[in-house]
Amino acid sequence: MPEGVSQDLLEKLKKNTTAEIFYDNFTRGRYSTDASIYQMMPHGVLIPKTKSDIVETINFAREAKIPLLARGGGTSQCGQTVNQAIVIDNSKFLNKILHFDKEKMICIVEPGIVLDELNRFLKPYKLWFPVDVSTSSRATIGGMAGNNSCGGRSIRYGMMRDNVIGIEAILHDGSTYNFENLELKNLKVNDGIAPKIISNLLKLALKNKQEILAKFPKVLRRVGGYNIDALLPDAMASRPNGKVGDGINLSHLLVGSEGTLAYSTSVTLKLSPLPAQKIMGICHFPSFYEAMDAAQHIVKLDPIAVELVDDTMLRLARDIDMFKPTVEAVVKGNPKSLLLVEFAEDNMDENLSRLRKLHDLIGSLGYSWKGDVKKFGGVVDVISNELQSKVSEMRKSGLNIMMSMKNEAKPVSFVEDCAVELKDLAAYTDGLNKIFDKYETKGTWYAHASVGCLHVRPVLNMKLQDDVSKMRNIADEASELVKKYGGSFSGEHGDGIVRSEFNEVMFGKKMIDIFRVIKTSFDPDNIFNPGKIIDAPKMDSRNLFRYAPGYSSDNISTILDWSIWPGQAGGFQGAIEMCNNNGTCRKLEGGVMCPSFRVTRDEKDSTRGRANSLRLALSGQLGKEALTSDEMNETMSLCVSCKACKRECPTGVDMAKMKLEVSSLRTKKYGLNLHEKLIAYLPDYASFASKFPSLFNLRDKIPGASKLSEVFLGFTAKRPLPKWRKDFFKNSELPDSLELNHSQLPVILFVDTFSRYFEPENVRSAINVLKAAGYFPFLPSSNKSSRPLCCGRTYLSNGLIDKAKFEGEKLLSTFLPYLKEGVPVVGLEPSCILSFRDELPSLIKDPNIDLLKNNSFTFEELLSNNCKKINFKKMNEKVLLHGHCHQKAFDAVKPIQKVLNMIKGLEVELIDTSCCGMAGAFGYNKKTYDVSIKMAQEKLFPAISKTKSGTTIIADGTSCRCQIKDGINRDAVHLAQFLDKNIIY
C-alpha cells in the first residue's frame, strides 16, 4: 500500500459505506492509466452505490488528507483521470436517469450514465443529447461535464457547457448544493459554504472582467482553465444558441473543472430534437492544405458537422477488417484528405438542396473528377442511413485507428486538439506541420474542421528520452503558435497533466492567480484531483509516464506467434501494448465486445482491464510471477474467448489469443484440476465413452447425481450435460480418399468432436447438402492414430498448447496432399474450423500451414459460392438467425444470410446479439454458470422470446444451441439441418 494509506484505513471506510472497495495491486493497476501517456498508481478504488457513499468518502478523505479522483469511462487523453488518490468509479452503479421531462426537453442523470445509453432511452421520444463525442459508447455524462466535452456537431449544438443547465455537487465539507441558473438562487451567505463561495467568485469575476475578456480565446472550442467567464453578467448570451437575458448559470463553473472543485452527483441536461433526416457528402481533396482552406467556405452552407479524415487514417482503416468495406464504399481514388460534411434539416428536400450546393461549391473551387490531376476531387454522396452510420463510426474511431500502428512509435496526444478560427486554420496547420518537420516526425490529422479544432498527434516513441524531448519542444512551440492566432491550446480534451502547465502561457500569471482562488475557495484541503489545471507537474515528467524510465518487460518464452509486433517475448509485449486505453471494449450495445464487461460492468472484465493487467504483470509491476498468479487467473476467468476484440477493437487487441498464452504458462506451472482435465481431454476419451452412452448419460437421470458432479467435478447442476449419442458419426460413413469423379467437386469434410458424438445428425445433413450442391465430401484418415482427427480446441482452452499443436500438426499432415491439389476443407462447428485460420497458424511453424489457413471454410462460406445447383422448396416462413461469436469475428455471418436468401419465400431475421454466454465449457462450470446465463439474458433470450414458439432458430454453434435450449427451452438447428429438410432431392 502507498505510504500513509493503510489497509486498515480503507477497511474502516469500507465498513461505513455500501461501496465496493479494492486496494490490491491488480485493481489499482487497472485504474492507474487512462487514454493518456501517464500512469499514476491510486491508493485504492471505490465503487459507490449511493450518494451517501460519496459523502462518507469525501468526509473520510478530508480528515485523512487523502486525495479523491472521480472517474467515469476513463477515456481521458490528457491524464485527467489518473492520480495518486482514491479513485471513485461512478460507471457501475451511479448510472441512472433520475428525471425526464419530454415537454421541457430536460433530464437529470447520475454521473455514471453512458452517453449512448442515455440517447437510446431518448430516441423513442425523438430527442437526444447532442454533445456527440467520439467515445459516446463508453463516455459518461459526469466525465463529459468534468471535461467540457464537445463532439463532432458542436458547430450546431455547442459544448457540454452549452447543454448543461444544472449540477448537484458535494463540496469539500460534505454538504450538497445545486448549481443552476443564478436567477433561481437566493445566495444567503450564512446558508452553507456554497453561497459564500459563489458570492465571492461573482465579485472576483466582475472585478477582473476586462482581464477575462482580454485573455480568454474568442474561439468556440475553448476548454482550458476554469470557466470564470461564465460568472460575468449575461455570460450565456455569447454562447451558441444563447440570447441576451439568459444570465449566469453557476453550473458552468463546474463544467470543465476536471473534478478539481467538487463532486458532481447529478447533472441536469438540455435536450434537443433528434434530427429527422440526415445526409452526407464526402469531399475529396488532393492535398491537406486545400481541404483546410475549403472548410471556411463549406461551413457557410450551415452543415451540422464538417469532419476531416486524412490519408494516413484512410490507409490504416483499409487494414482493419471492420472499416475496410466502408473505405472502399465511399472513397474515390487516392485523396490526401476528406471532409465529411453532414446536413440534418427536418426536410429531406432541404438536405438534398444543400448537398447540391456542396457539389457546386467544390466545383467552383476548381475540383473535378476529370481533367487536372492537381485538382482531382469532388463529392461522394452518402444517402443511406446505414452507410452514414458506418462512416461516422469510422471517424469516431479515429484515435484508435491511428493507434493501430504496429511499432513502438505511436501518435501521441499532447497538441491534438488546439483550436483556432477557421480563417486561420490552413495557416495554423501548415505552421504546425513545419514544427513536426523540424523535429523529424509527422502528424496524423482528423476531426472537427467545422470549428477549427483538428486532432493531430505526432508519431513518437515515449520509451525514448530523445522523443520525449521532441514532445517537450513541439509542445512549447505549438503553444506559441496557437497563441499567435488567438486560439485555444485545448479545444476539446481539456488540461489534465499534459496541458495544465501551459495555462500560464495561454492565460497569463494574473489569470492563473484567479484560477488558484477558485480552486482554494472550493477545495481548501486540496482533496479533489490535485495537480490538474493549476499547480500541475511538468507534462514531460517521465516518472509519471506509463513507460517510465527503466520500463522493460520480461523476455518470457512464448508458444504462439507474436512476431508482427515489436518488443520482448517474441512480440507479446508489443501486442499487449497495442491497448491504448480508449475503452471501446466498454461499449454496452452493438457488436459483441465485451460480453463479460456488459454483464458485470467491472473494469477487470473488460478487454482494456485485462490488457492493463497483462502489461503491468509482464513488466514486473505486479510482483514476481504475476502472469501465473491467482489474481491473473481471476482476471482472465470471465473472458469467454469470443474473439470479438480481435475484430472490434480498432487497435486489434486479441485477448482470446493472449489468454491462450497466459493459460499455457499457468497450466505448465500448476497443471489442471479434474474438471479442466475432463474438458481438455474430451477428444481422447470420447471414442471410449461413445460405446457406453447410457452409462455416461446417467448423470442427468439419477436423482442427486448432477449435484454430486457439481461438488466433485465442478459441472453445474443447473443445466444438463450434452447427451452422448449411440448413433454417433463414424468415419466409415464418408469415403476416406478422393475418388475420381469429374462431375463433383472434392471437399474434405472435417468432423469435429462435438458434432461426431453429440449431434451426428448435423454431419449427415451436411453430407446430403454438399452432395446436392455438387460436392464430393470425404474425410482422409490419419495413419498416426486410430482416434479421429481433432482441431485441438479443448486443449487450447485449457492451456495445453503443446497438445493442441500436436493435434494441429497431425491434421495438417493428413490433409496436406489434398490441400496441395487445391481441395478445400469445410467444417460445421465455427470454433473448430475457424481455428484452422487463427490459432493453428499462430502455433504451427510449418510453412504449409498457410495452405490450411487459406483453404478452410465454414459450411456456409463454401455453399455461398456454389449453391446454385440446389433446388430448394418454396417457403412462406420466417427464421431467426443467431451468429456464433467466431463467425462474427471473421465476418462469416453474411454467407449464412446469402445462402438462406436463395430460398424463395423465406424471411431471415438476423438477431442483434452479443455472445450467447455458453462459450463451450464456460456455461457448464459451476463458477461461471450465472454469468453465462446473464450474457444470454442481455440480448439473445429476449430476442427469441419475442417470437412465436414455432419459429425456426438457426444457430451454427453447438454452444449457442445448448444455451438456447437450456435457458428458454427453445430448439435451435444448424444451417445444415435446416437446408437438408428444405431441399428437393
Region locations from a protein language model:
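A glycine-rich phosphate-binding loop feature that marks nucleotide/adenosyl-phosphate handling sites
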Residues: 27, 76-79, 135-142, 220-231, ...
